[in-house]
């Protein structure tokens, strides 16, 4: 230390004090510009209470871009949300069930469509059943049907098939084979449904029994729909739910940031592909 002190031209006692001085605790970082984003972040969190900071960041940047303002880094949004207690509680539970290593994602749209049925239980005990079909690549829900008090029928699935083909191809027959992935429920496996699918150019594919993971795209959508829509809206009875469902599906397709699409919505992704 004497040699270093001589080279630097300072007293040894001063150098010793600098080396052994306790490091001052670093205060929390607070950038003035962060506070300008806080009202926007609070509003988005109030509107989307199930969204984590990455999806909130996507929505923040969507609004900033519309106003011609520069994007906010996700770390900045995280910092603001953490400082103001707006972060979601981290999930620490183990994922139940077996792991699935099969490939469920395809490389372009209109190669595989995934279909499934799920239920929403209303506060009065009534049950709404929903059948839907979603594209495995761009994640847009192509068609859906909802009923209360009854099960999903084969005719509903066939209507779904026709609506999806008409939406994507503007005709009643797909120009190439499209896989239709579902479970082994009777509405999907009925002979009339299989024959109808073939006439439309669809190729029915079925997951193994008791393996919902094999239809991972559809399974993930059901979790998203229940978490981000059904659980945060009033569900007093079936009539109320049925009145809201169309708006939920449209919001998912148009606005929901999807991690598999780079945090943009399915329709934003489709529009980006078309340009």
Describe the residue ranges of each PLM region.
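Charged DNA-binding/catalytic regions of mobile-element recombinases
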Residues: 1-275
